Amino acid sequence: MLYFLLQPLARDVRLFNLLNYITFRAAAAFVTALLVSFILGPAIIRRLRAMAVHQVVREGTPDTHAGKGTTPTMGGLIILAATFAPVLLWSRLSNRYVLLAMAVTAWMGVIGFLDDYLKLKQKREGKKNEGLVERYKLAGQVLCGLGLGAYLLLSPISTLPGASTTLPFFKYVLVVPAVAWAAWLYIPWVTFILTGVSNAVNLTDGLDGLSSGLVAIAVLTLGLFAYVLGRVDTSAYLQVFYLRGAGELTVFCAAVVGACIGFLWYNAHPAQVFMGDTGSLALGGAVGAIAILLKSEFLLLFVGAVFFAETVSVILQRTVFKYRLRRYGREYAQKHRVFRRAPLHHHFEMMGWPETQVVVRFWIIGILCAILALSTLKLR
C-alpha cells in the first residue's frame, strides 16, 4: 500500500526511492511484523486467557506436558496479524505471487481457527475435544490446493509453463509433462504438496517454540530463493530460471519470519501461548505456497526436512502398529512400537531429553538443512 501511495512522490522526496528496493521493503516488513507481535501479543494473550481458550493436552503425551493444559492456545492470531499487516503496508499488492501466498495463508488460517474454536466449544459443552471433523479439515485443505493448482495451470504467473517444476542441483532443468493431457496432473501435485506441508507443520507443533523456529528458518531460506529467482542478473549468474515478479515474495517471507520470531517471544519455553491449528496450518500453507509459486517444490526436502521426518514418524508408527495389531494382537503391538511416541519430537522426550534440548537440536538440524538448500544454488 505504501509503495503505491509514496513511490509516485519519489521525484520530490528522494527518500521515497527506497521503496523501489525489495531489500528495503523486506527489512521494513520484518521490523513491522516484530512490532505488531510485541504490541498486539500481550493483549491477545490476555484475551485468550480470559476466555479460557486453553490447550487440550492429549492422552499419552509425556508427563512434562501435564501443566500445559492451562496455557492459552489460538495464538496463531498473533502470527496472522503480524504477517498480513506488514505485507499490506510494504508489498506491491498488484503482484500475483504475493496475493496468492496471502490467500493460501488466510484460507489455511481460517480452517485452523475453526478447528481451535470447535475444540473450545466442545470443551465448554463437556464433549470430546475433537475439533473440526478430520474429513472436513482435509476437504478444506484439498479445496485450497485444487484452487491454487487450477489457477496456476490456467493462468501462469511466470514465463515458465504452468504445469512445471525445477530440480535442485541441475542447471536450467525444467520438469514438464510429456503429453498435453498430463498437465492436469499438476493440480493434484499442488494439492498434495500444500496439504502435506500444512499438516506436517501442524504435527511438528508439539513443543514450545519448535514449529515457529523451524518455519522461520525455512521461510527465510525460501525468501532468499525468491530474491535470487526474481532478479535477472542473479538468476543468470547462478544459472537458474528467472521468475519475473517472484522477488516480491521476499517481502512476504520477511513478514512471516518476523511474525514467527515475534511469536517466539511468547512461545519460548515455558510458553505463554500456543499457536494452535490457527497458526500451524496457516504457516504450513505459507511454506507450501511459497515453494509452489517458486517452482521449487523439491526444495522442501531440504528446508522442510524436519517437518518431513515428523510426518514420516507418524505414518510409520500408525502403519506398523495397525499391522502388528491385526497380526499379533493389541498387547504385542503396544509393546513393540517403532517409536516410543509419535511425532518424532515426543520420542526423544520419552528417551529423557529435556524439551528445550529437543527444540534447540531440531533447530540446529533445520539450520543445517537450510544451508544445504542454499548450496543447491551454486552446486549445479
UniProtKB/Swiss-Prot annotation:
GO terms for cellular component: plasma membrane. One of its GO terms (biological process) is cell wall organization. It is a multi-pass membrane protein. InterPro entries: Glycosyl_transferase_4, PNAcMuramoyl-5peptid_Trfase, PNAcMuramoyl-5peptid_Trfase_CS. Its cofactor is Mg(2+). It is found in: Cell inner membrane. Its EC number is 2.7.8.13. Disulfide bonds: none annotated. Keywords: Cell cycle, Cell division, Cell inner membrane, Cell membrane, Cell shape, Cell wall biogenesis/degradation, Magnesium, Membrane, Metal-binding, Peptidoglycan synthesis, Transferase, Transmembrane, Transmembrane helix. The chain crosses the membrane at residues 25-45, 70-90, 98-118, 142-162, 173-193, 209-229, 245-265, 272-294, 357-377. GO terms for molecular function: metal ion binding; phospho-N-acetylmuramoyl-pentapeptide-transferase activity; UDP-N-acetylmuramoyl-L-alanyl-D-glutamyl-meso-2,6-diaminopimelyl-D-alanyl-D-alanine:undecaprenyl-phosphate transferase activity. Pathway: Cell wall biogenesis; peptidoglycan biosynthesis. It is an enzyme of class 2 (transferase). It catalyses: UDP-N-acetyl-alpha-D-muramoyl-L-alanyl-gamma-D-glutamyl-meso-2,6-diaminopimeloyl-D-alanyl-D-alanine + di-trans,octa-cis-undecaprenyl phosphate = di-trans,octa-cis-undecaprenyl diphospho-N-acetyl-alpha-D-muramoyl-L-alanyl-D-glutamyl-meso-2,6-diaminopimeloyl-D-alanyl-D-alanine + UMP. Pfam families: Glycos_transf_4. Belongs to the glycosyltransferase 4 family. MraY subfamily. Catalyzes the initial step of the lipid cycle reactions in the biosynthesis of the cell wall peptidoglycan: transfers peptidoglycan precursor phospho-MurNAc-pentapeptide from UDP-MurNAc-pentapeptide onto the lipid carrier undecaprenyl phosphate, yielding undecaprenyl-pyrophosphoryl-MurNAc-pentapeptide, known as lipid I. PANTHER family: PHOSPHO-N-ACETYLMURAMOYL-PENTAPEPTIDE-TRANSFERASE (PTHR22926), PHOSPHO-N-ACETYLMURAMOYL-PENTAPEPTIDE-TRANSFERASE HOMOLOG (PTHR22926:SF5). This is Phospho-N-acetylmuramoyl-pentapeptide-transferase. It comes from Gemmatimonas aurantiaca (strain DSM 14586 / JCM 11422 / NBRC 100505 / T-27).
